[in-house]
Amino acid sequence: MAKNKRLAKAQSAVDRAKLYPVVEAMALVKSNATAKFDETVELSLNLGIDPRHADQMVRGLISLPNGTGKTLRVGVFARGPKAEEAKAAGADVVGAEDLAELVQNGTIEFDRCIATPDMMALVGRLGKILGPRGLMPNPKLGTVTMDVKGAITAAKSGQVEFRAEKAGIIHAGIGKASFEAEKLIENAKALVDAIQKAKPTGAKGTYLQKAALSSTMGPGVRVDVSSLTA
């Protein structure tokens, strides 16, 4: 009951018909993040794309300037010296066939998956498991690489993956409600900039169509897109 009252109060503070400048929107999101844990602040963007077409997929990685406040668990498929490099760099789980067996059995104890190029024949067999979870290593995203240490460091330092869903919407966490508003806004603008740079050549019309900010337990606040690109 208390949860419902809190949500109703938060929703009443938001004008759902209004497009808020990002500074106002962020202030509302932070003031409505009153759960007993440090809520994640999320940015949602509606893009003018049709992801059903291969040439209109939007996907990428960005290291947010102020981090995310979340520590990612990193899994690495590697052998020999590269496996040792991964362990030394702070990977949470490292392996080859043994790690593949764990994944096949449903034990996935990582949020980001990195692989050296020679491991992709093995990792490729796990595509039906890793793919739907957004965990499949991809050379375009820098997660199929010989620079294992660099990839792990990037993942652990606040790197965010963004990917358009079927409806052309991107959802991404940009930090915690405890962050200063200015830092959250800086992260949001950095994410929008990365998404703009990832605009597919096949996209027609307005690319950044709608934007909204929300916290884990709070209502969505519509944002004036132009205030995210200024």
UniProtKB/Swiss-Prot annotation:
Quaternary organization: Part of the 50S ribosomal subunit.
Keywords attached to this entry: Repressor, Ribonucleoprotein, Ribosomal protein, RNA-binding, rRNA-binding, Translation regulation, tRNA-binding
Protein's recorded name: Large ribosomal subunit protein uL1
One Pfam family here: Ribosomal_L1
GO MF, one example: rRNA binding
HAMAP family: Ribosomal_uL1_B (MF_01318_B)
PANTHER family noted in UniProt: 54S RIBOSOMAL PROTEIN L1, MITOCHONDRIAL, LARGE RIBOSOMAL SUBUNIT PROTEIN UL1M
Protein family per UniProt: Belongs to the universal ribosomal protein uL1 family.
The keyword Ribonucleoprotein appears for this protein: yes
GO biological process: regulation of translation; translation
Gene3D superfamilies: 3.30.190.20, 3.40.50.790
GO terms under cellular component: cytosolic large ribosomal subunit
InterPro entries found in the cross-reference section: Ribosom_uL1_bac-type, Ribosomal_uL1, Ribosomal_uL1-like, Ribosomal_uL1/biogenesis, Ribosomal_uL1_3-a/b-sand, Ribosomal_uL1_CS
Organism: Acidiphilium cryptum (strain JF-5)
Role of this protein: Binds directly to 23S rRNA. The L1 stalk is quite mobile in the ribosome, and is involved in E site tRNA release. Protein L1 is also a translational repressor protein, it controls the translation of the L11 operon by binding to its mRNA.
